[in-house]
């Protein structure tokens, strides 16, 4: 008889059987069953692969900040039983300080060009939520998640007049954009600029753009630089004008803001003061130009 294997099996059996009598002796898993209620969200719900939950255990000797990603509309995850605080967010964002419940924050990707920091690409809509739950062995906990918007949307419409025939495009660059936001406190951090292309609504002289951002840095100015791009030989007349949006964006804490400006192309490029507009209509995707 192999006494070494017999003794090992006996010890293992004793350990396994002891779990039936001593809850502190071994780790038992509880099950979290979570799904999202997006009824309060106007935007299209994100695909399952863009939904994430971060788990923060309380009083347990297991790592904090473990992230779970939805691969279906409902998340079913087996993790050690106990008290947890959970943070939920959507989108493909970097999470900084993911191990710290209060310091965890989403970060937008940035690039530095000639010493200036810019948001990379286009930020997408993002929503978030937080909840607490105690998970117990063999008692699945079913939790509906009701997120709220975690980004702000800024819409800008420019009404162009004057010498518009050679106008090929409008580009805007806005300063004072927050690059990160804490998931718990929702405070904003960082400072960068973002560049956005305007699209012309067919058969009109109205050019529109929309952008999502974590918010606007309260210590920075929000200067919008509008650059006109002319066709062909008229490109020598490409110009840029600036307008201060700080009075509208500083302290702005709602989900969405829409502004309208007048731009006149003549001997000089002139831009008017912004006006807040109550309703915003997106240009349908079928009417957007194809830049490919």
Per-region residue spans from a language model:
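A sequence/structural signal for flexible, mid-protein segments enriched
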Residues: 116-208
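A short, Gly/Thr-enriched small/hydrophobic beta-strand-prone motif that recurs across taxa
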Residues: 23-42, 146-161
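Bacterial N-terminal signal peptides that target proteins for export
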Residues: 1-7
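A short beta-turn/strand-edge loop motif at beta-sheet boundaries
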Residues: 42-49, 162-168
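Hydrophilic extracytoplasmic domains
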Residues: 225-292
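C-terminal motif of bacterial Sec signal peptides marking the signal peptidase cleavage site
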Residues: 15-18
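Short, low-hydrophobicity acidic/polar segments
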Residues: 63-149
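Tryptophan-paired
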Residues: 52-100, 167-248
